[in-house]
Design a protein with these regions (language model features):
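Positively charged n-region of N-terminal signal peptides that target proteins for export
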Residues: 1-4
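Bacterial N-terminal signal peptides
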Residues: 8-18
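Electrostatic cytochrome c docking/interface patches
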Residues: 20-42, 58
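Residues within well-ordered alpha-helical secondary structure of globular protein domains
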Residues: 21, 43, 68, 100, ...
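Gly/Gly-Pro-rich "capping" loops immediately C-terminal to redox-active cysteine motifs
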Residues: 34, 38, 50-91, 112-113
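The canonical Cys-X-X-Cys-His
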Residues: 42-51, 125
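C-terminal capping alpha-helices of c-type cytochrome domains
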Residues: 90-135
Length: 135
């Protein structure tokens, strides 16, 4: 009888532990989505931008872009149009800007970039920019 009780307790404990992993698990597709977003970022943005803090290229670094006031990095020489832009980057504004930068900030210095037409690709880039690996 003692053996049966111990055996039942061990099985119950094992089943409980299976249901409650010690480390929070990320959905399997989240890593794939970030990787896909990084690939899209690399194809559409990386020529001029990086996500490394302080590493400006032709364009400013996009580290922690969401929540940042437009044209506000002290270490980058923005166009007067971007310096004068009176908004804070959020996902919606970033989506519209990536699609048609001249409509959001006329006079920006992003020529010859004309925008990223695919809403799916823009969403991938934005998800990548807000991911913990880039912030």
């Amino acid at each position: 009888m003692f053996r049966t009780a111990i055996s039942g307790l061990v099985c119950t404990t094992f089943l409980v532990l299976l249901g409650f992993p010690a480390v929070p698990q990320e959905p399997a597709d989240k890593g794939a989505a970030t990787e896909s977003g990084q690939q899209t970022f690399n194809n559409a943005c990386r020529t001029c931008h990086t996500t490394k803090e302080g590493d400006n290229r032709l364009g400013p670094n996009l580290h922690n872009i969401i929540g940042r006031k437009a044209g506000s990095l002290q270490s980058y020489g923005y166009s007067s149009a971007m310096k004068g832009a009176d908004f804070v980057w959020d996902k919606e504004k970033l989506d519209r800007f990536i699609a048609k930068p001249d409509e959001i900030v006329p006079g920006n210095n992003m020529k010859p970039y004309g925008g990223l037409a695919s809403a799916e690709d823009r969403a991938k880039v934005i998800a990548f920019l807000e991911s913990p690996t880039t912030n």
